[in-house]
């Protein structure tokens, strides 16, 4: 018997044990996020928004894979930082490295649960950073940390729900955008 067969049998045994005790089952819809490195989880959130808004007409969308600095995606010149986290053992989404910067307009928090996606969009200028954990103050990291429970976020199931959330929070009027584009023609 080769080592791969033995190793796979052990993986199966452990996976069955984990499936009995964890909310993250091997069969969960979004279990694959747990296999990604932390920075690649961020890429998942950024690319998800890219693909959601690339199907939206009459908007200007800017996204470049990798680190653009203080924002990740731009919609009609509104700069958005994307923070993606998965549900932890305490039933929270932990978001790290949050920056208080004038060079970005919003933060989109994407929470990935085993079988659900959640979002929350916050305008940076309206965040009370004094209520967040400043990781830099104690030398435990950089930026701020902000945790959310599922109840503090909005569950999203469709592309249209995400678009509606963004338009409402960013103050964009889809009909007005279309009207302005038609008047320029």
Language-model segment annotations:
Residues 1-78, 83-185:
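Nucleic-acid endonuclease domains
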